[in-house]
Amino acid sequence: YQETNKIFDNRNSYSKTDHDATFMRVKEDPMLNGQLKPAYNLQIATSGQFITNFDIYQNPTDTRTLIPFLNKQIKNNSLGKYIVADAGYGSESNYRFIEDKLTNNIPLIPYGTMLKEQSRKWKSDDRKVMNWYYNAKDDYYLDPNGVRFNFNAYCKRTDKHQFTRDFKEYEAEKYDIN
């Protein structure tokens, strides 16, 4: 049991034939169905169509590879002025790292729901808090049913990767569902 735990090393899976590989969803069949196969996550940085840096990670998600990859580029002095990546790299922890540590760089990384938020369907969805009326002076939201959500407290949450998020908590005033 302890040996198996040691092989896992902060992962959810590993291959019995290649302990360094992690099971990842790969889209290699014609229907693009994601099948779990032992794999690695390759990251490549380019500038002017030349490869300036690369690294291989056991982590299946791009979100958690960005910070170590940027640190490697800083160490190798290969980080360009612009940091360009797709929405798979967009996360609060990545944005905060770039804002705090890489103040001379310009990040061009959309967040995961950016394109959806620009759609007519999203903008007309009354369940989305961003579509509710907000009063900045008194710090409250009004939902489409007229229920008022008042500011309650500042909160912090730390995820399993030790990233702490700061957010505001709102509480609904009494509401009769009938």
Predicted regions and their residues:
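Anion-binding and metal-coordination hotspots
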Residues: 1-178
